[in-house]
């Protein structure tokens, strides 16, 4: 077991479902020393749970982290897009590395299986959206295998119980940021993102379908590129798998996937939250390894 002095000191800002699932993931890792879980409501279920897990908590939000800035090195921001834009002013001035789990689009966009190695010097890394983390690997794989993508549409369906207040408040930002990232990572001429919140009980597992109109010469190359990318995602999101292999019909390509959560805190059907948290851990682990390598040279 690593000593605490060799671990990266972590603060989690946001005590909702994403923040709590992150708490369990961080506590299970020997790379990190979880210092704080910070929220806004002292009586919230999230902060009560964190306290019961022997984690120091505060309901003073960003003010608490300002007052304790020497006690942590890395922040997971699991608040909202609007809040993150305010929060990052302090984190940037204080030289804190931030992993942004909101669709604020302030920092460098990251999908670990695509561009994790480019994140070494970034102060702020943005994880786009849950639908983005699910669909962008396939969009990028498609780009590698076709000549041109004229239109790209992504439809994600998630369980209502996995869509918290922040998710519902950020719907507009979700669409805008996902569509922007789809265009950036696929070079598609036009993109569209749709999010369906399914009220069915028991909760349904996250599913994402990608539709594309593209020009290609060898569809076997598309299949191979997608299959290779799925394996790369599964290295940090074990529950990621295709349910519809790439299909073609008159220039239209369809690919379907599902994400089963790891069940660290959230139900297995909440793959939409699990995938963005797994991506966050991948980024944090990369930064930890980079920092430790630099310290030994």
UniProtKB/Swiss-Prot annotation:
Active site: 130
GO MF annotation list: acetaldehyde dehydrogenase (acetylating) activity; NAD binding
Record: residues binding NAD(+): 15-18, 162-170, 272
Full protein name: Acetaldehyde dehydrogenase
Keyword Oxidoreductase: yes
Disulfide bonds: none
A GO biological process held by the record: catabolic process
Keywords of this entry: Aromatic hydrocarbons catabolism, NAD, Oxidoreductase
Pfam families xrefs: AcetDehyd-dimer, Semialdhyde_dh
Family listed: Belongs to the acetaldehyde dehydrogenase family.
Catalytic activities: acetaldehyde + NAD(+) + CoA = acetyl-CoA + NADH + H(+)
Gene3D superfamilies (UniProt xref): Dihydrodipicolinate Reductase, domain 2, NAD(P)-binding Rossmann-like Domain
Membrane-spanning segments: none
Top-level division of the source organism's lineage: Bacteria
């Amino acid at each position: 077991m690593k000593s605490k002095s060799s671990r990266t000191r972590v603060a989690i800002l946001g005590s909702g479902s994403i923040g709590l699932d992150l708490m369990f993931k961080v506590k299970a890792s020997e790379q990190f020393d979880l210092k704080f879980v910070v929220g806004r409501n002292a009586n919230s279920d999230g902060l009560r749970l964190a306290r019961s897990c022997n984690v120091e908590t505060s309901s003073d939000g960003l003010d608490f982290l300002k007052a304790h800035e020497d006690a942590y090195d890395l922040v997971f921001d699991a608040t909202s897009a609007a809040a993150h834009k305010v929060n990052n002013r302090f984190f940037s001035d204080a030289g804190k590395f931030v992993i942004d789990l909101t669709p604020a689009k302030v920092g460098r966009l990251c999908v670990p299986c695509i561009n994790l190695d480019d994140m070494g010097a970034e102060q702020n890394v943005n994880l786009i959206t849950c639908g983005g983390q699910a669909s962008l690997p396939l969009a990028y794989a498609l780009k590698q295998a076709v000549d041109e993508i004229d239109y790209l549409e992504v439809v994600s369906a998630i369980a209502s119980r996995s869509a918290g207040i922040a998710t519902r408040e950020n719907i507009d930002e979700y669409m805008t940021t996902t569509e922007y990232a789809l265009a950036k990572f696929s070079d598609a001429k036009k993109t569209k993102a749709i999010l369906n919140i399914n009220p069915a009980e028991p909760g349904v597992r996250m599913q994402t379908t990608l539709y594309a109109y593209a020009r290609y010469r060898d569809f076997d190359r598309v299949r191979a590129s997608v299959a290779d990318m799925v394996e790369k995602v599964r290295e940090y999101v074990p529950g990621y798998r295709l349910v519809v292999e790439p299909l073609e019909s008159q220039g239209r390509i369809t690919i379907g996937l599902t994400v089963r959560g790891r069940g660290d805190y959230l139900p297995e059907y909440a793959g939409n939250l699990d995938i963005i948290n797994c991506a966050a851990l991948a980024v944090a682990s990369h930064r930890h390894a980079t920092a430790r390598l630099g310290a030994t040279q």
